[in-house]
Amino acid sequence: MQAQSLAEVTVISKAAAVIVAAGRGERAGQSAEGPKQYRLIGAEAVLARTLRAFTDCPLIGTIAVVIHPDDHALYRRAVPEKHENVILVTGGPTRQESTRLGLLALKDEAPQYVLIHDGVRPFIGQDLLERIIANLTPDNGVLPALAVSDTLKRAAADGMVETTISRTGLFAAQTPQAFPYAPILDAHEKAFAINRTDFTDDAAIAEWQEIAVRIIEGSADNTKLTWAKDIEMADKRLRQDHAVFPDIRTGNGYDVHSFEPGDHVTLCGVKIPHEAKLNGHSDADVALHALTDALLATRGAGDIGTHFPPSDPQWKGAASRIFIEHAAKIVREAGGRIANVDVTLISEAPKIGPHRAAMTQALCDMLGIAADRVSIKATTNEKLGFVGRREGIAAIATATVIYPGEVPE
């Protein structure tokens, strides 16, 4: 059967994908950032860059990302965006088993084709993805590979050269390796059933089960990050590619709410016992309201009242988490990354200190950023003005966001 055109593939079915990212990356050494798939290259986690290549491809539907059971927090930090077509799968003790579990997670959907990719190949390009899918048929899988160009030597046990190996017909395999879904799942299940764990890639399992695999030209850019030096070179490459003055934007927000009878206030999404509550159309979370305005300001996107007018009854009593997550979504959709948020609460009471850790964590969860990028401070008004008279609470917020591109001249 001949390879299909991209248009034909799009009409017939979107391919699914399995991104395998459950390894420990021991050869890359230890890092405070975690295993190598979570290390930063060009200020972005390796896995986040890898995943984006697949979410950006219109020919790919559901994506199963297979991660280690201990890595859920690392994943949320690396990939704060929520993608409707991405599912998280807990991996197994080996890459082969993690791949099988990723394939099983797609079983109810039963896609026509599936691409299986290493999570630490972050430079996979759209052209290669499209060529792989275009060459898939129900009768064959596709393996991107590069013809071996270096002279190959076989060494004896003592390290001395034993013989030279012909390069003719030899290729270095890459990923994603793509297959008709049902046959490759069946092959993995058969290997699992007899405890065969010695396959070095998915194409080898396909060969074992006599699934035809077509080799197409891979990409020299599509390198696998194995060693610490690979990660260093990848980071250097990206920084050189983007050696321009970054588009760093800062937004400010201010809000104030008065007290009324009640038994708690809500600040940064955390309920704090108090002798009064804040008066407002929503939950009156003065901190989140100020921060929402600050984030919107980095896009010139108006203020909280523009997006959630107090005249609209649907926002009566609403949790302000809705507002801040909406603002963060606007930032992300523009390619922005939140570098830092700073909130200052101005109040005589209640005391903020005992609740600062919970408030910080709440903001981390809402914005998908690390705790060292969140600052929450409190001060009194030295008994001056409405704050000094304990009539309400004010908040000032600042957000710093990095957007793609450079500052225009």
Curated annotation (Swiss-Prot):
Purpose: Bifunctional enzyme that catalyzes the formation of 4-diphosphocytidyl-2-C-methyl-D-erythritol from CTP and 2-C-methyl-D-erythritol 4-phosphate (MEP) (IspD), and catalyzes the conversion of 4-diphosphocytidyl-2-C-methyl-D-erythritol 2-phosphate (CDP-ME2P) to 2-C-methyl-D-erythritol 2,4-cyclodiphosphate (ME-CPP) with a corresponding release of cytidine 5-monophosphate (CMP) (IspF).
Record PROSITE patterns: ISPD (PS01295), ISPF (PS01350)
Gene responsible for this protein: ispDF
Binding site for 4-CDP-2-C-methyl-D-erythritol 2-phosphate: D255, V256, H257, H281, S282, D303, I304, G305, T379, T380, N381, E382, F386, R389
The protein's required cofactors: a divalent metal cation
Molecular function terms from GO: 2-C-methyl-D-erythritol 2,4-cyclodiphosphate synthase activity; 2-C-methyl-D-erythritol 4-phosphate cytidylyltransferase activity; metal ion binding
EC number of the protein: 2.7.7.60, 4.6.1.12
Name the UniProt record assigns to this protein: Bifunctional enzyme IspD/IspF
